[in-house]
Amino acid sequence: CKGKGAPCTRLMYDCCHGSCSSSKGRCG
């Protein structure tokens, strides 16, 4: 999974913590 601030997609489990911010395109 991806860490905070990492570029991400809209996949729910793409980020280790929290979810992907669709506006910034980064993990929150």
Curated annotation (Swiss-Prot):
Membrane-traversing stretches: none
Tissue expression as described in the entry: Expressed by the venom duct.
Presence of the UniProt keyword Metal-binding in the record: no
Signal peptide range: none
Residue list for modification 4-hydroxyproline: 7
GO cellular component, one term: host cell presynaptic membrane
GO molecular function: calcium channel regulator activity; ion channel inhibitor activity; toxin activity
Residue numbers marked as site, Essential for calcium channel binding: 13
S-S pairs: 1-16, 8-20, 15-27
InterPro entries in the cross-refs: Conotoxin_omega-typ_CS
Keywords, in A-Z order: Amidation, Calcium channel impairing toxin, Disulfide bond, Hydroxylation, Ion channel impairing toxin, Knottin, Neurotoxin, Oxidation, Presynaptic neurotoxin, Secreted, Toxin, Voltage-gated calcium channel impairing toxin
Domain of life, per lineage: Eukaryota
Cellular localization per UniProt: Secreted
Keyword Disulfide bond appears in the UniProt entry: yes
Residues modified to Methionine sulfoxide: 12
Residue positions, PTM Cysteine amide: 27
Function (record text): Omega-conotoxins act at presynaptic membranes, they bind and block voltage-gated calcium channels (Cav). This toxin blocks N-type calcium channels (Cav2.2/CACNA1B) with high potency. Unexpectedly, it does not show any blocking activity at amphibian neuromuscular junction. In vivo, when intracerebroventricularly injected into mice causes shaking activity, and, at higher doses, causes mild tremors. When injected intramuscularly into fish, it causes paralysis, and, at higher doses, causes death.
Note: Found in injectable (milked) (IV) venom.
Domain notes: The presence of a 'disulfide through disulfide knot' structurally defines this protein as a knottin. The cysteine framework is VI/VII (C-C-CC-C-C).
Family: Belongs to the conotoxin O1 superfamily.
Protein name: Omega-conotoxin-like CnVIIH
